A protein has these predicted regions:
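Compositionally biased, low-complexity/repeat regions
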Residues: 1-437
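Acidic/polar low-complexity surface segments
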Residues: 427, 513, 521-539, 587-635, ...
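Extracellular/surface-exposed low-complexity segments
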Residues: 739, 744-839
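Right-handed parallel beta-helix
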Residues: 555-565, 583-595, 635-650, 656-669, ...
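N-terminal extracellular ligand-recognition/capping segment immediately after the signal peptide
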Residues: 88, 448-509, 513-527, 562
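Short glycine/acidic-rich loop motifs that flank beta-strands on beta-rich extracellular proteins
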Residues: 480-481, 522-525, 531-532, 566-574, ...
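C-terminal, active-site-flanking charged/polar segments
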Residues: 116, 381-388, 393-416, 720-763
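Right-handed parallel beta-helix/beta-spiral solenoid domain characteristic of secreted/periplasmic
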Residues: 493-574, 594, 599, 610-613
């Protein structure tokens, strides 16, 4: 409990009273009495401070924001507290700039925190110059033309230049400079209509996440004459189960650019950070928005190329264990080359192209074999669509240095912070707060100690205090519970060569540091159990009660980790195979389901999707070989999955499961075969029942079969079956409405009571709700994001009048409504706003 004694009244008393108080037969009675007064006085003191802070929009409590808005005459909105606060804070400044493009863009950013760009579409209409009044700034003939108007310059209202791929790549984007004929059709959601009154407001909904300093996957060497080609996949996931010869089976990553305005605003401090109206920084410039990198604009030397806006190259001291001298730039992709082998080189930078090193964007589906012109020495080729980088060097020594020492900082896109992402994280709280800075806080850096994770787990079987293991980088860390250094900390349950479980004497937290996304590569499944379950001797009731209390408090928490399978991971095994603890928490993690589409030939014959693998297989009984331990273990382990992405969860009824703002993927999207189970029992998924389950904002790709279920805001893409339909209630959910396969008849769903839910195949047909996702493939930018074609009831009639599913907490429906309300107030007469999502 927080101590509220802000003013020490007892210490302010004259010393004579304190002396007499200490000399009483029962000493310090006055001090005890004043302690109660001090506590109440502290509450009053704190409340007075809060009342002062509530006078200012930058520091007031959330509930005060609409009252300050009333003083300004601002209409009330609902949604994310940050956006509402920014909307009120900038009210006066935006009113002064009402009707300008800058005000509209800033208003859109305040209400959504998305990238925004406004275009007056009348400027893109076809237009002919008056022969007697030619515009020099728009390409008038000499002597009316300006020197800045080059051969490749796009003329307003003119024809398309076909000789510059970098400029052509802008066609159909928010920065399209080409001319179009007038489009008189009525506006449609997300459609661009080029006409005089239309103002297009382009919005980048996907967030850009930057992984700072990771190791790319070296593929192999190639040769182009005397030039050595060094091939890398940017995605650090090695996929060791894929043989080296089958390179097309590895996982691509779509490279994104960073949002410069977000990065700029993140560097501002204090209350000034909220006041965006005073920022002179442009909100959305070409090549500086959080969208996919355009391949054609990466080519150096092209008239419209801008590789310096997407890519930077620097050298670093490879002998440094902490990489403190590493300079992270603001671009989407940064290559860090070893200083010893590449010292003194001149790299391409803005307005200063390198004399020797060149940059090119190209399709690297066949690596250097498909390049025209061929790969040259001191050339870097980037394929942002597949996430590949190719270097051309003239010596094998340099090629070896790149293979062993190259580091990359790259950016990718995702709908929001569900799964493992490099996001800011607060210090450990609750059960682990006391250990965040004490002797049980263990920091892991791969370059300082490659076996640091194993060392951090030393003595967890003896330490009764909570242990915090924080991984402070974004490299790949191997964890093997069968490692020789963990012999004392693990148990094989008396079976020689059997699976080993990590023994715990107190709570354990393994987390990513703030703004990091480490990869945890397992050599065998994770298994957890108490270090001691039965008292010694078993008849010692006091000791047994103490052990029972310790086991009930035994919590394992994984936070911010991307958990994958390693080289020797047993085939068919789940990532987590045992949780004989009080509570297992998976927070902001990705328990890699795989299921991705690997590198492969271009459409129309894309490669097949990789199989999906189980995330958990937790059985009852709980894996104790000694009957006495199994009998004494009284806990019903709680499994909590919060804002995470997992593969199938096969868990028996002896556990409880809580899913919040998460995605559970069995590889079965809308319209796919419904045979795979996403949540079910650990034995036979088709006949066993899963645990009692609570859901809140979850998207489930696959069938669900549980003992009972309650909650709200879930999307069940396939059938949901609850054994006990008399227990629990589901609200604001989507059910598939699937039918049982013949010869059986009737609905496949077995549902408890439900309220305000919709079905994909409802009767009558007009009541059915269409469900569509931007992508159903893990790792793709729009994974599990609801598409615009989804029924509005799914997008806007979930909990709190927002969307159902894993991303409902983002309040996107509120953002769209708030934009429409504010634009009606800010739009000039005769101007029609078109809201167009780019991602």
């Amino acid at each position: 409990m927080r101590d509220e004694r802000r003013v020490p009244l007892y210490a302010r008393l004259p010393e004579i009273y304190r002396t007499k108080d200490a000399e009483l037969p029962a000493p310090f009675q006055l001090r005890a009495y004043l302690a109660l007064v001090e506590q109440a006085f502290g509450h009053i003191h704190r409340n007075v401070e809060e009342l002062y802070h509530d006078l200012f929009i930058e520091t007031c409590a959330d509930w005060v924001v609409p009252y300050i808005g009333d003083l300004l005459g601002t209409s009330h909105l609902s949604g994310d507290p940050w956006t509402l606060r920014a909307d009120v804070a900038d009210t006066i400044a935006l009113r002064r700039r009402k009707g300008t493009l800058g005000a509209i863009e800033l208003l859109a950013y305040n209400l959504t925190r998305w990238g925004a760009h406004c275009v007056e579409l009348r400027e893109n209409l076809v237009w002919n110059q008056h022969l007697n009044h030619q515009r020099p700034d728009e390409g008038g003939l000499p002597p009316y033309g300006l020197p800045t108007v080059k051969r490749q310059t796009v003329m307003r209202g003119g024809t398309v230049t076909l000789r510059d791929p970098a400029m052509l790549a802008l066609r159909g984007t928010p920065f399209d400079p080409f001319a179009y004929t007038a489009d008189v059709k009525p506006p449609t959601p997300g459609g661009v209509r080029y006409n005089l009154p239309n103002l297009a407001i382009f919005l980048w909904r996907l967030a850009a996440y930057r992984v700072a300093v990771s190791r790319p996957v070296f593929v192999d060497f190639g040769a182009v004459g005397p030039v050595v080609a060094v091939r890398f996949n940017v995605n650090p996931l090695t996929r060791p189960d894929v043989p080296p010869a089958a390179q097309r089976e590895r996982q691509p990553v779509r490279l994104f650019n960073t949002h410069r305005f977000d990065l700029f605003n993140a560097k501002r401090e204090g209350t000034d950070k909220l006041d965006l109206s005073r920022v002179t920084f442009d909100l959305s410039l070409i090549d500086e928005v959080p969208g996919p990198v355009l391949l054609e604009r990466l080519t150096e030397g092209a008239p419209a190329g801008a590789p310096e806006k997407y890519l930077s190259v620097e050298t670093y001291d490879e002998a440094s264990a902490t990489l403190q001298r590493l300079d992270i730039s603001d671009v989407g992709l940064q290559l860090h080359l070893p200083e010893t082998s590449f010292a003194g080189e001149e790299w391409p930078v803005a307005q200063l192209p390198a004399l020797a090193w060149k940059v090119r964007g190209a399709n690297l589906c066949a690596w250097e074999a498909g390049l025209r012109p061929p790969l040259a020495n001191k050339e870097i080729v980037v394929d942002p669509v597949r996430g590949r980088v190719l270097f051309g060097v003239n010596t094998q020594a340099r090629a070896d240095a790149l293979r062993d020492q190259l580091l990359v900082t790259y950016t990718y896109g995702a709908p929001g912070p569900v799964g493992s992402h490099p996001v800011p994280r607060p210090a450990p709280s609750g059960l682990f707060a006391a250990s965040a800075s004490g002797p049980n806080f263990r920091r892991v850096l791969l370059r300082q100690n490659p076996a640091g994770l194993h060392d951090a787990l030393q003595n967890v079987h003896l330490n009764p205090a909570p242990v915090v293991v924080e991984i402070a980088d974004s490299f790949t860390h191997a964890l093997d519970l069968g490692h020789p250094s963990l012999v004392e900390e693990t148990s094989d349950e008396g079976v020689v060569g059997g699976p080993r479980s990590l023994m715990l004497n107190g709570p354990l937290l393994i987390r990513a540091a703030s703004n990091q996304r480490p990869i945890l590569k397992l050599q065998r499944p994770l298994r957890f159990r108490p270090a001691k379950v039965v008292a010694t001797p078993p008849t010692d009731a006091a000791q047994q009660a103490e052990l029972d209390g310790r086991v009930s408090n035994l919590t394992v928490r994984l936070e911010g980790l991307h958990v994958v399978r390693g080289e020797n991971f047993p085939a068919g095994e789940p990532l987590i195979a045992r949780a004989a603890v009080g509570r297992l928490e998976i927070i902001n993690c990705t328990l890699d389901p795989e299921g991705f589409i690997p590198f492969g030939p271009s459409p129309p014959s894309p490669p097949a999707r990789r199989p999906v693998r189980r995330a958990m297989n937790l059985r009852e009984p709980y894996g104790f070989s000694a009957p006495a331990e199994e009998e004494v273990f009284k806990e019903t382990p709680e499994v909590v999955v919060h804002r995470s992405i997992t593969g199938p969860l096969h868990i028996d009824r002896g556990y409880t499961l809580a899913l919040t703002d998460s995605v559970v993927d069995a590889g079965q999207g809308v319209g796919n075969d419904a045979a795979a189970f996403a949540v079910s029992g650990a034995g036979n998924p088709s006949s066993d029942w899963g645990p009692p389950t609570t859901v809140s904002g979850v998207t489930v790709f696959g069938r669900t079969r549980v003992e009972s279920i309650t909650g709200r805001g879930a999307i069940f893409v396939h059938a949901l079956e609850a054994r006990d339909v008399q227990k629990g209630c589901l609200k604001y959910c989507y059910f598939s409405g699937e039918r049982k396969p013949l010869p059986a008849t009737g609905p496949a769903d077995r549902l408890p009571q439900n309220h305000a839910c919709v079905r994909g195949s409802a009767q009558p047909a007009e009541e059915s709700a269409v469900l569509r996702f931007t992508s159903e493939i893990p790792g793709e930018p729009g994974y599990a994001q609801l598409a615009a074609a989804t029924d509005f009831r799914v997008r806007e009639r979930g909990p709190a009048d927002d969307q159902m599913g894993a991303y409902g907490f983002l309040l996107e429906a509120h953002k769209w409504r708030n934009l429409q309300i504010r634009f009606r107030e800010f739009m000039p007469v005769g101007v029609r706003a078109l809201l167009i999502p780019v991602t």
